[in-house]
A protein has these predicted regions:
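Pre-Walker A (pre-P-loop) alpha-helix and adjacent loop at the N terminus of AAA/AAA+ ATPase modules
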Residues: 1-46, 108-117
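Short glycine-rich substrate-engagement loop in P-loop NTPases that contacts/grips substrate
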Residues: 20, 82-122
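Walker A/P-loop
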Residues: 32-91
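Conserved nucleotide-binding/hydrolysis micro-motifs of P-loop NTPases
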Residues: 47-49, 95-100, 131-133, 147, ...
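Conserved catalytic/switch belt of AAA+ P-loop NTPases
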Residues: 108-116, 126-168
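Conserved AAA+ ATPase core "coupling" helix
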Residues: 163-196, 205
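The conserved phosphate-sensing helix
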Residues: 204, 212-226
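Conserved C-terminal helix/linker of AAA+ ATPases
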Residues: 225-238
Length: 238
């Protein structure tokens, strides 16, 4: 964690360990990406589980991976995003009148420029809540997703509303509620530590209770842990 902001893969919780391992393979560059027609990473699951935050962080983590500054013998889940960020990511908040034409034109514009700015030699595109585009607009994105030098990071709360052609072009990463409340304890402890609250002041059992109440929402979990930290004299990090 960088203050209260996730800055590595291990700052997120995954309901499917196989899916997290896929991301680890990509970030460690053991699994080529894009490869075999898979040009996107689609994060799907319920609200508040960190999908948008992770979608915007993944390009940063890939830049660290391709820069060669991280010792790949160390767990890649701990690999941090570069500080300060130099990554130029084009972010599209789907819905609200955003058209597929606008997205396609932007992708083509980036794809035609030379040289590519990033260490990965790819351009990065985030499509947040892609299911909010109508099905025709989604289908028209299949072609730009096939352009060279492009990586796409998509999120959705409703996987069944995403065009099958887009789904087929993506690695699917499930982000739903983790069934074991104990899995949330390290995250809560990290937040409290960043607030200056001593170890054990808020017990593991209390953190598990907060996790159960949050029902999978990292937004609610983080909020309630912060409130506990403030109640015990902690301060928000600068």
């Amino acid at each position: 964690m960088n203050g209260m902001t996730p800055n590595c893969l291990d700052d997120f919780l995954f309901s499917n360990h196989t899916d997290k391992h896929t991301l680890e393979l990509i970030l460690s560059r053991k699994l080529p990406f894009p490869f075999g027609g898979k040009t996107g990473i689609l994060l799907h699951g319920t609200w508040g589980t960190g999908k948008t935050t992770l979608a915007e962080l993944l390009p940063e983590l890939l830049e660290t991976a391709y820069s060669g500054t991280w010792d790949m013998s160390v767990a890649v889940g701990q690999m941090p995003a570069p500080e300060p960020s130099h990554t130029q990511t084009e972010i599209f908040r789907c819905g609200g009148g955003l058209s597929s034409t606008t997205i396609s034109q932007s992708v083509s514009k980036f794809n035609n420029r030379m040289p590519v700015f990033h260490f990965s030699q790819h351009d990065y595109f985030v499509l947040d809540e892609v299911e909010r585009l109508n099905i025709g607009a989604q289908q028209s994105l299949r072609s730009p997703m096939g352009l060279k030098r492009c990586m796409f990071f998509l999120t959705t709360n409703y996987l069944t509303k995403v065009d099958p052609g887009i789904v087929n072009r993506c690695h699917l990463i499930e982000m739903n509620q983790v069934t074991t409340p104990n899995a949330y304890v390290p995250l809560g402890q990290s937040i409290l530590q960043n607030m200056g609250v001593g170890t054990g002041v808020v017990s593991a059992a209390e953190l598990q209770g907060i996790a159960a109440k949050a029902r999978g929402s990292l937004r609610d979990y983080t909020h309630d842990v912060v409130m506990q930290g403030l109640a015990h004299g902690g301060v928000m990090p600068a």
